[in-house]
């Protein structure tokens, strides 16, 4: 059984990695333009050929990006009509990079917060949409991270989750071994 000290050590190791090497580093986004799309249309586009039929009205949508890194993912979330975005990350260096890039693009309506997913309840908010890609697998207990995210997801909300897998990375590993 692993103790809290082990969990803390892993958190610190991940935090240290991204403090030293904010990820992903990006200089510009080719053809970036802010456009708006309804959440229903955005989700239907992403899950094609499947479809959702929801009555998302014109209420303001609260969006959480859990593990926003250097902010590139934030640009994609800006497409949601009538939305307010909160983006969290463990790494202050990554958040500083995100802030700098968003400022360069004239984007000032995103709340950036340094926070571990394990502390997500401290925000005191619930969200209509939660995006978390490439993050949970870094946690000592990914299931606990998912449970906490689901705890701040509103009823009938949407969770966009991305995990790394050995199968999905097989070609990358093969290419690296070849090089």
Please place each PLM-identified region on the residue numbering:
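A short glycine-rich, Lys/Arg-flanked "PGG" loop and its adjoining helix->strand segment in the class I
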Residues: 143-155
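Conserved SAM-binding loop of SAM-dependent methyltransferases across substrates and taxa
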Residues: 70-82
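Conserved SAM/SAH-binding beta-strand->alpha-helix loop
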Residues: 91
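Conserved SAM-binding strand-loop segment of SAM-dependent methyltransferases
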Residues: 106-118
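Short, small-residue-biased leader/transition segments that mark boundaries at the very start
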Residues: 3-8
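Conserved alpha-helix/loop element of class I SAM-dependent methyltransferases that forms part
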Residues: 20, 25, 30-61, 76
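Conserved class I S-adenosyl-L-methionine
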Residues: 158-179
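A short acidic, Gly/Pro-enriched loop at the edge of an enzyme's catalytic core
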Residues: 120-130
